[in-house]
Amino acid sequence: MMISIFSLLASTAILVFANGQSNVKLEFVQAMWRHGERASQVDQYPIYEKDWIYGGGGLGELTAIGMGEMNELGWLIRKRYVTKLKFLTPKYASREVYFRSTNFNRTIISAQSLLYGLFPPSLYDVKNVDYPYSPLTWFPGFTFVPVHVDGPDQCAASQNCPCTRYDLLQGQMLTLPEVLPKYTQVVLLNRRVGGYYNMTSGLDSFTTYPDTWKCQRAYFNRTMYAKLPWYNEELYYQAQVTYAPVKGFLEGNFENPAVTSSGLDVGLEIKKVRSGVIINEVFNRANEKLNCAELGQNCTSYLNKLKFYGYSIHDNNVYGVLVALGIPQIANTLDGWPAYAAGIFMEFHRNTSTNERFFKVLYREGDDTPISDVTSQLPICNGATLCPLGALQTLAETLKPLPDITTLCKTPL
């Protein structure tokens, strides 16, 4: 009898849980990803701009491999949100999706490559409705999807707006016990490598080689070994791991409390000017969308039918958001910053019965990896796999640049 009672209670609990979960509906997705593999951004012996012929040629340009990486990511997004969840329609619908990019060829073409995977030519596309029927001059089923490019005053994604305060904060970082030893290691390595290149000045600030080597070795590894007798895998590895903690500091990631002797919380202040804008933008847009979903047909906002909002950005941008969310370690790379084609997916859910609001965070590490749920790893979620939206709201309020990013960036410490 006792066993029967426990069985009944367990069955009831499972039924209640299932019913509760069935009322939770995915309403909105906001995603941000790093562009695909690119050429080096600078000339560095023995490889120069003329050697970078890939993807149209030039320094910093997306390569064909990078296009393929982004196309694969587009297919993964389609698999999840079109095929599995039936959340997006199978073909491009202008009111359902919106895509932004920073004003760089590599991020723009990355977005286009991703969209070619998300909305590939298919039987869902109707000739003379979705594309012109011109068999000899137009690939059947191919449709364009717009990518909106950020202007110079849009700091949410690019983090490239001038910020004097950020420059001052970097100076304050050097007063922290955690930081100075790591910076010293970087400077010593810079001097060593600069000597190999026969540099006579600017050695301390010679910081481009770790990233440049990463690009060069992918396409010109034999040339590097032939022309650089001192170069080897051990030195490459040393450069990546030596720079990793410093790259973390630049986005506000510290292992210890980053408070100066005067009481300035350097870590918090860096996050405000680096990731605060995009975190607040994402939260505010999600909150407005969920308000709209609650209103149903009475909602007149442009968000009424919008389901997916995407940012095509850079490694430091994606990393800044990981730092803000408290999960920088999931980047899982030698240099600490996200790999090519890595991405964050923030899903926003609503209980249609109670109007309770939740969010989930998913992450894709890079090429040839799946999109995985990492919600329970967020410190603000306390192990929950469906995190209350209030946790994200509190984070956004904590990191909000006040009164606005432009004014804050001009404000002295």
Curated annotation (Swiss-Prot):
Source species taxonomy: Eukaryota, Metazoa, Ecdysozoa, Nematoda, Chromadorea
Family: Belongs to the histidine acid phosphatase family.
Keyword Disulfide bond recorded: yes
Enzyme nomenclature, EC number: 3.1.3.2
Disulfide bonds: C381-C387
One Gene Ontology term of the molecular function aspect: acid phosphatase activity
Organism per entry: Caenorhabditis elegans
Family annotation (PANTHER family): ACID PHOSPHATASE 10-RELATED, ACID PHOSPHATASE-RELATED
The protein's name in its UniProt record: Putative acid phosphatase 11
Keyword terms of this UniProt record: Disulfide bond, Hydrolase
Residues forming the catalytic site: H35, D315
Catalytic activity: a phosphate monoester + H2O = an alcohol + phosphate
A Pfam family reported for this protein in Swiss-Prot or TrEMBL: His_Phos_2
InterPro entries (UniProt xref): Acid_Pase_AS (IPR033379), His_Pase_clade-2 (IPR000560), His_PPase_superfam (IPR029033), Histidine_acid_phosphatase (IPR050645)
Top-level taxonomic group: Eukaryota
